[in-house]
């Protein structure tokens, strides 16, 4: 249920408070600033989405861990070995470094605003015509994967992600069982080796 999903996100946010409080604070500040029009060039304010911390956390997890199911990521962030069930501080620290690097990209102002050009290319001008914020968040994660992991040409990436987002919105791809659908989409990336492969998959 949706309540369960929110609780899982809350568990991870609580872990962040304990082991990486600066990361949670940065996440919450970014979300607040999306709601405040600002004259600064570096403001995350936009006309598409006013995200909550749990939404951008999902983007970081999808991008960094290539996972959508938060329960599994919660366990690895606690330092749990999913095969043996054992916990270790070293494993936890390693996983938090992955989350830290992912969140840096998700909260990067240039990435954030470049992504909105994808939505404009898809024919969207504002958030009230977008039916699924989850779809937007997951598309942002896929955009970052294409940009950073596969070094896709910026023009080709924008064009392909615009088509991906438009079709996702049209088919309500992430409107129900969003975690399951995104988990499948991320699993499909396992066979992708090049930027061309990434574009072909989408």
Model-derived regions, located:
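A cross-family structural signal marking well-folded subdomains
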Residues: 2-12, 19-202
């Amino acid at each position: 249920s949706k309540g369960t999903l929110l609780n899982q996100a809350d568990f991870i946010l609580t872990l962040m408070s304990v082991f990486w409080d600066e990361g949670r604070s940065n996440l919450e500040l970014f979300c607040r600033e999306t709601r405040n029009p600002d004259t600064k060039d570096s403001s995350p304010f936009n006309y598409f989405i006013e995200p909550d911390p749990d939404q951008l956390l999902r983007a970081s997890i999808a991008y960094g861990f290539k996972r959508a199911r938060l329960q599994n990521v919660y366990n690895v962030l606690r330092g749990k070995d999913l095969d043996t069930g054992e916990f270790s501080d070293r494993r936890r620290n390693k996983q938090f470094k992955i989350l830290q690097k992912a969140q840096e990209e998700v909260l990067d102002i240039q990435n954030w605003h470049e992504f909105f050009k994808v939505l404009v290319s898809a024919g969207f001008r504002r958030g009230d015509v977008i039916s699924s914020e989850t779809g937007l968040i997951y598309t942002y994660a896929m955009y970052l994967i294409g940009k950073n992991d596969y070094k896709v040409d910026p023009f080709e990436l924008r064009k392909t992600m615009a088509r991906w987002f438009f079709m996702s919105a049209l088919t309500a791809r992430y409107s129900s069982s969003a975690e399951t659908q995104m988990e499948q989409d991320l699993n499909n990336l396992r066979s992708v080796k090049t930027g061309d492969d990434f574009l072909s998959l989408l």
